[in-house]
Design a protein with these regions (language model features):
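Conserved beta-strand/loop scaffold segments within soluble protein domains that form the structured core
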Residues: 119-122, 126-404, 418, 422-446
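N-terminal amphipathic, basic helical "cap/leader" segment at the start of enzyme domains
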Residues: 2-155, 324, 329-330
Length: 446
């Protein structure tokens, strides 16, 4: 059982002294922001299963904050010492406008196309950006998108983030190739806190791919990420997160996207690893003509647990969103999808859809799907749907009649089922990489 002290979030490693240590050399405004976040964290109760948004994820059973320490790893700038899996992932991501590599919370490599840098594109560690671009960071970091008040974990992250990523695209600048970030985690019994801040100015265009990797952990490790993506008027932004963490990882991510007038802001969350995954994704449509496509793909085996909590907030007239989350579950894995479309008063002309589909590959696998609508306008087109089913017998029979063995036929059906998500955001390299990981998991099913 958790102690009362732990339920309020105070542990041997997570405490005001840790916040002060991180803030000691930071500007006053950031010190105050961290301190405020810790105050919010302390007074915000730890989520329990009594809350609808946490009903299927019991933190008493899935997260032991008291056993976690903050990272003590040294910065690894020598590429020869980097893990082989990390280097392999980077080798697959050569086609890019820029790269960043983060190992155990330290940014150890950054490069950006010289022509884009000359146009004002910024790709930097968040610590460097605080020093070099204080006005931009102060305006956007933990303010409108993911403030500390967003929740218990958002407050903890805002107080204890160690480093992160800042990507800025000036007005009218288009990046033809994606920005690729590769993160590696190695320490067991550790809590990692990082942030992603992306600002795309008027009529800019950018794609961002964030891949998280680790081997299996000997004891539980938590990776906490707060993601803030801001698309100004007429900007086009794609945000992709590929989570491939090892067993023993508790992956927690709070993501908020802000889409202004006539902008397009699409997201893709791929969850293949970690023992426990919790993603809170909120898309806010803030200007007429704004659009957001929200895609998700997950594949579970063993006793993996996935919990996706999504919301589509249509705050003004004539905005659109379309969510599609699909997952395949084997072994005793469990997925939870909870989604809501909110149409605010006066937001006429809203066009919003939400679909969650699950494929159960084992009698012990489980999926819970809870789509919902909250509509306060009358001239709207909104729908939601959810399905939970088994492998299509007719599809398997057809493939077997063409000479394929049963196991191979089942793999093709699963790949086809999940492939619909990837086909909607065919970003170079991502589709192939994710497909390979899914094939590997399918090939190793018991």
């Amino acid at each position: 059982m958790m102690s009362t002290e732990l339920m309020e979030g105070l542990t041997e490693a997570l405490n005001p002294a840790a916040v002060e240590k991180l803030a000691i050399s930071e500007p006053q405004w950031l010190r105050e922001r961290r301190s405020h976040a810790w105050d919010v964290y302390e007074r915000t109760p730890m989520p329990t299963t009594k809350l609808e948004e946490w009903r299927y994820t019991d933190l008493k059973k899935t997260l032991d904050l008291d056993a976690l320490k903050l990272s003590t790893a040294e910065s690894m700038t020598d590429q020869a010492t980097w893990p082989a899996r990390l280097r392999a992932a980077m080798d697959e991501d050569r086609d890019a406008s820029g790269h960043m590599v983060i190992i155990d919370g330290h940014v150890v490599h950054t490069d950006i196309d010289e022509g884009l840098a000359a146009k004002g594109v910024i790709l930097e560690s968040l610590h460097d950006a605080v020093a070099k671009h204080p006005e931009l960071i102060q305006e956007h970091l933990a303010t409108e998108a993911v403030p500390a008040e967003e929740g218990k974990f958002a407050a903890l992250n805002a107080a204890l983030w160690n480093d992160g990523i800042f990507l800025y695209v000036p007005r009218g600048v288009a990046l033809e190739l994606p920005i690729r970030v590769t993160r590696w985690f190695s320490e067991s019994a550790t809590a990692y806190f990082s942030r992603v801040l992306i600002v795309a100015e008027h009529s800019s265009q950018v794609s961002y791919v964030d891949e998280m990797l680790s081997d299996d952990f000997e004891s539980q490790t938590m990776t906490s990420t707060a993601v803030e993506v801001i698309a100004k008027q007429n900007a086009q932004v794609q945000y992709v997160a590929v989570q491939r963490l090892g067993k023993g990882a508790f992956y927690q991510s709070v993501q908020r996207t802000l889409a202004h007038r006539d902008s397009t802001l699409d997201t893709l969350n791929v969850a293949l690893g970690a023992s426990v995954t919790r993603v809170d994704l909120n898309a806010r449509l803030l200007g007429p003509g704004a659009n957001s496509d929200m895609l998700g793909l997950y594949f579970g085996d063993g006793d993996q647990h996935f919990d996706f909590n999504t919301s589509q907030d249509h705050t003004v007239p004539n905005t659109s969103s379309d969510l599609l989350y699909k997952g395949a579950l084997d072994g005793a894995s469990h997925s939870v999808f909870r989604g809501i479309i909110r149409v605010y008063p006066g937001a006429q002309g809203t066009d919003a859809y939400q679909t969650n589909r699950n494929l159960l590959l084992s009698p012990n696998a489980r999926a819970d799907s809870l789509p919902n609508l909250e509509i306060e306008a009358d001239d709207v087109k909104c729908s939601h749907g959810a399905t939970i089913g088994e492998l299509d017998a007719e599809a398997k029979f057809y493939l077997m009649s063409r000479g394929l063995p049963l196991v191979q036929a089942e793999r093709l059906v699963v790949l086809g089922f999940l492939g619909e998500v990837l086909s909607k955001l065919p970003l170079g390299g991502v589709v192939e990489k994710v497909s390979r990981v899914i094939e590997h998991k399918l090939a190793h099913q018991g």
